[in-house]
């Protein structure tokens, strides 16, 4: 059924197709239809971050930026859902066209630019949802906020989403907001992490519970840079790392239609680069922080590959666009077939 739906959706522009898909998934969730259309994944419970996940396969941020289809995605069999990236104030994002399919490579290029309706809209949608599973909320900075003041935007969002999130992801790795990736390095990273940790401690006292913080990083760093990030996360007391965001590289899409568009590349071509980042992180972290792996999972075996590389959880986005909900079950089954780790 999804193959037919995809054929119809792919006749539309990528962004129109995306918006229509969110509407349809949301409507299916309200009517309780989505769970009838997809096989329930095998039970594969896992405990990470002090949270209980029914399975380790989640929805990556970016697909449901505004939380408009939480219940719909919640009925498809995901072990957890991450919504956003959301910013303090609504913003339109970059000019269109800004989203491009590369079906020959099972890939997508986007330069969306954190288009979203703002954190208050997202929270209204979260509070209206019936979903009670693990919900991550991904936060970012507004386009017109100087990078030097980025911490202010992150703290505004953290204050607002804290009570409603199972965990919060801090996005410092989107390539589509100028200067954002500089926050992954040196003193900028340390200052951001210190501010986040201090605010997390204050919010934990206020709300009576500690909400984990995850930092989402790029796949385009050197091994040495990745190691420095890992050390900074441990030193600052962060709770998890998500590896990875989209890549600025174009390996695997050279010469394809839209292959030279500006923006972040996701899907199959980023798989090896993302998995390598997971391996480097796993070696540096030694189990001190859990890794949530994202990037290039278009088959069940790719999800298992991420877990074998050292991840505790995985997320899918582009693979979901190309393969639909069946990929969730496929990924869970592939992970379940891995030898058990002590």
Swiss-Prot record:
Domain of life: Bacteria
Keywords: Cell membrane, Flavoprotein, FMN, Membrane, Oxidoreductase, Pyrimidine biosynthesis
Name listed for the protein in its UniProt record: Dihydroorotate dehydrogenase (quinone)
Intrachain S-S bonds: none
A Pfam family that the UniProt record links to this protein: DHO_dh
Subunit structure: Monomer.
Localization (cell): Cell membrane
Entry annotated with the keyword Nucleotide-binding: no
Cofactor: FMN
CDD domains, sorted: DHOD_2_like
PROSITE patterns on file: DHODEHASE_1
Lipid bilayer topology: Peripheral membrane protein
EC number: 1.3.5.2
GO CC annotations on file: cytoplasm; plasma membrane
One GO-annotated biological process of the protein: 'de novo' pyrimidine nucleobase biosynthetic process
Positions with a binding annotation for FMN: 61-65, 85, 138, 171, 216, 244, 267, 296, 317-318
Key word Cell membrane present: yes
Function as written in the Swiss-Prot or TrEMBL entry: Catalyzes the conversion of dihydroorotate to orotate with quinone as electron acceptor.
Involved pathway(s): Pyrimidine metabolism; UMP biosynthesis via de novo pathway; orotate from (S)-dihydroorotate (quinone route): step 1/1
Binding site for substrate: 65, 110-114, 171, 176, 245-246
């Amino acid at each position: 059924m999804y193959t037919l739906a995809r054929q119809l959706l792919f006749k539309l522009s990528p962004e129109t197709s995306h918006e229509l898909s969110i509407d349809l998934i949301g409507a299916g969730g309200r009517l309780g239809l989505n769970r009838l259309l997809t096989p329930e994944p095998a039970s594969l419970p896992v405990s990470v971050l002090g949270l209980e996940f029914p399975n380790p396969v989640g929805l990556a941020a970016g697909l449901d930026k505004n939380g408009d289809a939480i219940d719909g995605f919640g009925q498809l069999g995901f072990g957890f859902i991450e919504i956003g990236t959301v910013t303090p104030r609504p913003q339109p994002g970059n000019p269109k066209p800004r989203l491009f399919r590369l079906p020959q490579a099972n890939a997508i290029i986007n330069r969306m630019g954190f288009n979203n309706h703002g954190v208050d809209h997202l929270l209204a949608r979260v509070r209206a949802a019936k979903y009670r599973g693990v919900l991550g909320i991904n936060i970012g900075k507004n386009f017109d906020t100087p990078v030097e003041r980025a911490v202010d935007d992150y703290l505004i969002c953290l204050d607002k989403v804290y009570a409603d999130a199972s965990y919060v992801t801090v996005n410092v790795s989107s390539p589509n907001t100028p200067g954002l990736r500089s926050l992954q390095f040196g003193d900028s990273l340390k200052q951001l992490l210190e501010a986040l940790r201090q605010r997390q401690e204050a919010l934990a006292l206020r709300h009576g519970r500690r909400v984990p913080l995850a930092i989402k990083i790029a796949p385009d760093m050197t091994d040495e840079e990745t190691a420095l990030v890992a050390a900074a996360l441990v030193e600052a007391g962060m709770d998890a790392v998500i590896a990875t965001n989209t890549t600025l590289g174009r390996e695997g899409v050279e010469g394809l239609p839209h292959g030279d568009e500006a923006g972040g590349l996701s899907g199959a071509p980023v798989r090896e680069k993302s998995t390598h980042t997971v391996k480097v992180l796993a070696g540096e972290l030694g189990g001190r922080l859990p890794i949530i792996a994202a990037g290039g999972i278009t088959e069940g075996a790719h999800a298992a590959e991420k877990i074998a590389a050292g991840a505790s959880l995985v997320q899918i986005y582009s693979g979901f666009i190309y393969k639909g909900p069946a990929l969730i079950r496929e990924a869970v089954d592939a992970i379940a077939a891995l030898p058990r780790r002590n």
